[in-house]
Regions:
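Non-globular targeting/processing and membrane-anchoring segments
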Residues: 1-24, 41-47, 51, 58-164
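Short His-Asn-centered micro-motif
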Residues: 28-34, 39, 55-56
Length: 164
């Protein structure tokens, strides 16, 4: 989630597995560079219940290779997904995994970026099984927030029960 000046929020952030994960001693959280107050109203609008934290004012996102400053971008290439990437934006997708041991120490154990993240997008998983596949002109060009599809009522959510 970038600062709302750009008014952009990734449409893929909709997690329904949190309860299952919690019973496996796993916590799923999202981290955004924007100040917390800038994305809490959006979180409520989407009906999202996962923990969402702000890294505003810290280097957290840069430390894990998903945020880049203007000087890095002006150089023509940034290190993203463990390789030089000439067409990166200021914010790029990524997921990192951490382990907290019984002593309370936290260890970074895994990160995935770009195409390594599509396994987390169940819509893509289902589309990949179909004859037309993803049927995209550009990556995720078809994806909308759940309340921005013409046929969806404003109260609809990707995890709500459909009425028949």
């Amino acid at each position: 989630f970038v600062p709302l000046v750009q008014n952009l929020v990734c449409q893929t952030i909709s997690y329904g597995a949190n309860r299952h994960l919690a019973h496996h001693d796993v916590s799923l959280v999202a981290v955004s560079r924007a100040p917390l107050e800038e994305f809490q109203a959006f979180r409520r609008r989407m009906g999202w219940r996962f923990d969402w934290y702000s890294s505003y004012g810290s280097d957290f996102n840069r430390d894990f290779g998903v945020s880049f400053d203007k000087a890095q971008l002006a150089a023509g290439s940034v290190d993203y997904n463990y390789q030089p990437t000439p067409d990166a934006g200021e914010e790029m997708p990524g997921a990192s995994v951490f382990l907290r041991n019984p002593a309370g120490e936290v260890f970074h154990t895994y990160s995935a970026y770009a195409r390594g993240l599509d396994i987390l997008l169940t819509t893509y998983t289902f589309l990949d099984l179909t004859p037309k596949g993803r049927n995209e002109d550009a990556i995720m060009d078809w994806l909308r927030h759940h309340d921005r599809y013409d046929e969806a009522p404003k109260s609809a959510c990707c995890h709500a029960q459909a009425s028949h």
